């Protein structure tokens, strides 16, 4: 007699470029036959690139709820909540698993109202510092604590994030928070590196002795591109190497970024804006260093993908960064908001091809098993089963 499948309704904020989309896609596509998964999500915000091509690449279909938007809105939130309840009524899930803040609020509210047996939430990052003022931040903490108390389980994507959620922000007790790191299809980043590098260098007109430095991510205040531009200004005065800087991404600060690029270009800096690049695996292979300057992060995907591409990395010390970079081995971790220290470490990588090569090789060894999606699937299946057992 066939065993009844465990039905999982997976709800994600929105299908934009980033870790949550990959995470939700792999968990929908690759769970074993013991599970049946339905994926639901909102659409990207204005200025964001959608990630529906990622779902298409892996043959995943999703239900789109256009009313589920990042910013709170009474009317659209109420419509989204009702649509989620309708989906739950029809699908009859054993587990509702929400990913990120808006999906976590609306999805869990719908699941509680509809008496879903097991309700799980993953924090892909959090908004408890560097996003809002004190009053709004405290309100969000209050809401998250209330939701966490009713949830069957809470997932953090790094050990540091678990500590922040439990000890600093008091969202839930540490023993109720399970750490399950993200997982990715990393092999595509590591294959045919020489051919991919040659293609990108040719496409962008880069010579052999050019050092290509990129920052990849949403053009939003939290990503702190302003710090990156400060670093560029310091660097250009302190090396004779031929440098080319790339800004990859898009978002609300696009006009600011374009103005800064125009200014730096007038000062003789070769700096280029690409918007989003879909084939990031090929692009990465052509880079020499990939940077992250964020004020706050969960687990920054661009840094994992860079190391899978055997590219050296440098990042501010935020969120789960220490869980994904082997400091002084695959890259450098520096204090946030300190352009001088960041520039000094970046100069080491600029000046030494041998260090870049060593860091790149170490990076691939560091991430290839730790962040592969097969590990993610195994961890999540075991966690789901344990929660189902607890519910019996």
Where are these regions (language model features)?
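A short, active-site helix/loop in glycosyltransferases that binds the activated sugar's phosphate group
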Residues: 150-176, 184-188
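Nucleotide-activated donor-binding/catalytic signature segment of Leloir-type glycosyltransferases, i.e.
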Residues: 258-275
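A conserved mid-protein helix/loop that constitutes part of the nucleotide-sugar donor-binding site
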Residues: 21-26, 211-234, 252-258, 340-341
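Aromatic "clamp/platform" in nucleotide-sugar-dependent glycosyltransferases that forms part
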Residues: 276, 295
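Conserved acidic donor-binding segment of nucleotide-sugar-dependent glycosyltransferases
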Residues: 327-328, 332-339, 348-354
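Short hydrophobic beta-strand element within catalytic cores of glycosyltransferases
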Residues: 312-315, 325
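A short helix/loop element that forms part of the nucleotide-sugar donor recognition site in Leloir-type
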Residues: 50-54, 190-206
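N-terminal strand-loop element at the rim of the active site
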Residues: 10-18, 22-76, 161-166, 252-254
């Amino acid at each position: 007699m066939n065993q009844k499948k465990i039905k999982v309704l997976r709800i994600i904020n929105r299908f934009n470029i980033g870790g949550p989309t990959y995470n939700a896609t792999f968990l929908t596509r690759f769970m074993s036959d013991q599970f049946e998964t339905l994926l639901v999500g909102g659409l990207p915000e204005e200025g964001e690139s959608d990630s529906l091509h990622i779902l298409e690449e892996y043959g995943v279909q999703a239900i789109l709820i256009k009313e589920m938007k990042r910013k709170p809105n009474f009317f659209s939130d109420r419509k989204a909540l009702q649509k989620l309840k309708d989906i739950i009524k029809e699908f009859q899930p054993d587990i509702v698993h929400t990913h990120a803040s808006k999906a976590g609020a609306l999805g869990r509210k719908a699941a509680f109202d509809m008496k879903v047996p097991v309700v799980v939430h993953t924090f892909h990052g959090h908004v408890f510092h560097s996003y809002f003022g004190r009053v709004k931040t405290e309100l969000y903490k209050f809401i998250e604590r209330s939701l966490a108390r009713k949830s069957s389980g809470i997932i953090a994507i790094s050990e540091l994030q678990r500590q922040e959620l439990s000890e600093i922000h008091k969202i839930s007790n540490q023993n109720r928070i399970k750490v399950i790191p993200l997982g990715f299809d990393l092999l595509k980043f590591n294959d045919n590196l020489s051919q991919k590098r040659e293609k990108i260098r040719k496409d962008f007109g880069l010579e052999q002795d050019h050092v290509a430095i990129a920052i990849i991510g949403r053009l939003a205040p939290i990503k702190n591109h302003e710090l990156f531009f400060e670093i560029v200004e310091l660097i250009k005065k302190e090396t004779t190497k031929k440098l080319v800087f790339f800004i990859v991404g898009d978002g609300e600060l696009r006009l600011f970024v374009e103005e800064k690029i125009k200014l730096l270009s007038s000062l003789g800096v070769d700096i280029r804006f690409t918007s989003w690049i879909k084939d990031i695996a090929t692009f990465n292979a052509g880079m020499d260093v990939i940077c992250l300057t964020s004020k706050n992060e969960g687990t920054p995907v661009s840094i994992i993908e860079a190391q899978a591409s055997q590219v050296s990395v440098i990042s501010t010390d935020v969120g789960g960064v220490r869980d994904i970079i082997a400091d002084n081995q695959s890259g450098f971790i520096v204090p946030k908001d300190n352009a001088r220290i960041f520039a000094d470490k970046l100069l080491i990588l600029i000046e030494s091809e041998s260090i870049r090569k060593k860091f790149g090789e170490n990076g691939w060894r560091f991430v290839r098993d730790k962040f592969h999606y097969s590990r993610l699937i195994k961890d999540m299946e075991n966690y789901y089963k344990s929660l189902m057992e607890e519910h019996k």
